[in-house]
Curated annotation (Swiss-Prot):
Purpose: Odorant receptor.
Extracellular face of the membrane: 1-57, 112-132, 191-227, 292-304
Location in the cell: Cell membrane
High-level lineage: Eukaryota, Metazoa, Chordata, Craniata, Vertebrata
GO cellular component, one term: plasma membrane
Species whose genome carries this gene: Homo sapiens
The protein's name: Olfactory receptor 2T4
Sequence ranges on the Cytoplasmic membrane side: 82-89, 153-171, 252-268, 325-348
Length: 348
């Protein structure tokens, strides 16, 4: 009875019940591998960013400040788009979706990393690692397709302005946005289960600050070459489709802008497109390095730096790009800041 109590308290009731089921299985070795991968007996160890830093406390504070800036910047952008009627257009609807993804994206990795540093813990259980991997891959995939959708929206707005309200009505926007989230979740449901079912080495030290797919795969003690080829092909497809949409959209946009008579119209179109292209280059460039370059180009240190760039810095930069260079957003922000004191004065 004491053994039962100990097992229940140290593995969790779900794992304890699964152990009972495994005793009746015909494949004991497979069960041992599954238990080692999925219970708390052998947690992963995240070596993280702070291990090699000369000033880990300062780095922790900087990342925390950046995290707060990302959350507040994207939250303010979503609030402005929701509250200002002039921003109730398809373009700003997709920008609000991008901000929502960025808030979730940075929240998947940074809070766990900071909490571990403060608590002096660097372990993560296999289920937690799998959940982190799933949400990370899902959000990254969703953002790939959302950036392509935003490029298509700009193409319709600039090249077919008269048909724009019909082609990009509210129902179409909801459908496209839902499709981006769905396709991203397909990536998560595809890569996460396969990656987490590989048998891992005894050390289980992940040379990263979160459970990124390539970093976890490096721990596998079995041949992953076939899966890596499959993952590479999926990434090529996942990147190729949005890149084709973005490239063709902006090619047609440039041709349309070239034929415009109004200098003001050309300037506004260039400003809108350049903001989006900046975000595309930042996000896609980092993704291509991580998932498409050969392993000879990779080192744990380089991978972590690139991951810091597109998991921590990009969510901070995006709202700045779409707000500071956008007169409509800045106008809505000024209106909100001026209305608030006037409202308080009227209440007094």
């Amino acid at each position: 009875m004491d053994n039962i109590t100990w097992m229940a308290s140290h593995t969790g009731w779900s794992d304890f019940i699964l152990m009972g089921l495994f005793r009746q299985s015909k494949h004991p070795m497979a069960n041992i591998t599954w238990m080692a991968n999925h219970t708390g007996w052998s947690d992963f160890i995240l070596l993280g960013l702070f291990r090699q830093s000369k000033h880990p406390a300062l780095l922790c504070v900087v990342i925390f400040v950046v995290f707060l800036m990302a959350l507040s910047g994207n939250a303010v952008l979503i609030l402005l788009i929701h509250c200002d009627a002039h921003l109730h257009t398809p373009m700003y609807f997709f920008i609000s979706q991008l901000s929502l993804m960025d808030m979730a994206y940075i929240s998947v990795t940074v809070p766990k990393m900071l909490l571990d540093q403060v608590m002096g813990v660097n372990k993560i259980s296999a289920p937690e690692c799998g959940m982190q991997m799933f949400f990370y891959v899902t959000l990254a995939g969703s953002e790939f397709f959302l950036l392509a959708t935003m490029a298509y929206d700009r193409y319709v707005a600039i090249c077919h302005p008269l048909r724009y309200p019909v082609l990009m009505n509210h129902r179409v926007c909801l459908f496209l946005s839902s499709g981006c989230w769905f396709l991203g979740s397909v990536d998560g449901f595809t890569f996460t289960p396969i990656t987490m079912t590989f048998p891992f080495r005894g050390s289980r030290e992940i040379h990263h600050f979160f459970c990124e797919v390539p970093a976890v795969l490096n721990l596998s003690c079995s041949d992953t070459s076939l899966y890596e080829i499959f993952m590479y092909l999926c990434c090529v497809l996942m990147l190729l489709i949005p890149v084709v949409i973005i490239s063709s959209s902006y090619l047609l946009i440039l041709l349309t802008i070239h034929g415009m008579n109004s200098a003001e119209g050309r300037k506004k179109a260039f400003a809108t497109c350049s903001s989006h292209l900046t975000v595309v280059i930042l996000f896609y460039g980092a993704a291509i390095y991580t998932y498409m370059l050969p392993s000879s180009y990779h080192t744990p240190e380089k991978d972590m730096m690139v991951s810091v760039f597109y998991t921590i810095l990009t969510p901070v930069v995006n709202p700045l790009i779409y707000s500071l260079r956008n007169k409509d957003v800045m106008g809505a922000l000024k209106k909100m800041l001026t209305v608030e004191p006037a409202f308080q004065k009227a209440m007094e």
